[in-house]
From Swiss-Prot:
Domain remarks: The N-terminal domain interacts with the head of the 30S subunit; the C-terminal domain interacts with the body and contacts protein S4. The interaction surface between S4 and S5 is involved in control of translational fidelity.
Protein purpose: With S4 and S12 plays an important role in translational accuracy. Located at the back of the 30S subunit body where it stabilizes the conformation of the head with respect to the body.
Family per similarity comment: Belongs to the universal ribosomal protein uS5 family.
Natural source organism: Bifidobacterium animalis subsp. lactis (strain AD011)
Coiled-coil segments: none
Polar residues compositional bias, start-end: 11-24
Recorded superkingdom: Bacteria
Region (Disordered): 1-54
Protein name (database record): Small ribosomal subunit protein uS5
Example of a GO biological process term: translation
Keyword match Ribosomal protein: yes
Pfam family, one: Ribosomal_S5
Length: 243
């Protein structure tokens, strides 16, 4: 065998070895990618749940004001947005955002509202008892209403009620008609609401002595309806995950 033939044979063996090594490396990479695929899908599923939770939040822009500030070199204009955020199921918050652009002001207002979320006691879509809230010169009265009444309120109060999940209520706004004062007075009223157990514990009485029988019956019916709705939602979610 000549030297040229030997060199050719060695070169062919080297190429075959490199090809085998590359194929094995590709198989390993493919296996790792497949293994990561399951984790990635699970991570995507968790991410979708979080996104769905964020998407379930309701938001209402109550008002957008144009604000100007005078400097030595002239005036600069910005926008202030009053935003209400809630889940429509007893949680609501109000925020205020300022920026030179309207979308940025609304986004800041939404973030500020999410930082000030609080729970609102409800019984079958209405408040637990009459209450009055104040903010500077603004006063807002809230009264329980029968099912089917709807939200009897102005635009500012209605935005708070919708985000809080209150569907039947009678309201009256007095004094200042400024949207900021009206919304803050509404929030002050909602924060004064109490559950019958809290009132009974403070007075040293039983719940039956504090709350009317009709109120307790409506509350029990509301709890049963909410439990049924949660079970149906879980069943739908399980069916979607199974698909």
């Amino acid at each position: 065998m000549s030297d040229n033939e030997k060199e050719t044979q060695v070169a062919e063996e080297t190429q075959n070895t490199q090809a085998t090594a590359e194929s094995s490396n590709n198989d390993e990479r493919r296996g790792r990618r497949n293994n990561r695929g399951g984790e990635g899908r699970r991570g995507d599923r968790r991410g979708r749940r979080e996104d769905n939770h964020e998407n379930e939040m309701l938001d209402r822009v109550v008002t957008i004001n144009r604000v100007s500030k005078t400097h030595k070199g002239g005036r600069t204009f910005s926008f202030a947005a009053l935003v209400v955020v809630g889940d429509g199921n007893g949680t609501v918050g109000v925020g205020y955002g300022k920026s030179r652009e309207v979308p940025a002001a609304i986004a800041k207002g939404q973030l500020d509202a999410k930082k000030h979320l609080f729970n609102v006691p409800r019984i079958r879509g209405t408040v637990t008892h009459p209450v009055t809230g104040h903010d500077h010169a603004g006063t807002v009265m809230l009264r329980p209403a029968a099912p089917g009444t709807g939200v009897i309120a102005g635009s500012a109060v209605r935005a708070v009620m919708e985000c809080a999940g209150i569907t039947d209520i009678l309201t009256k706004s007095m004094g200042s008609a400024t949207a900021v004062n009206v919304v803050r007075a509404t929030v002050d009223a909602l924060k004064q609401l109490e559950e019958p157990e809290e009132i009974a514990a403070r007075r040293g009485l039983s719940v039956q002595e504090v709350a009317p029988d009709q109120l307790l019956r409506e509350r029990a019916a509301g709890i049963a309806e909410a439990r049924k709705a949660r079970e149906e939602a879980k069943a739908e979610a399980a069916a979607k995950d199974g698909e």
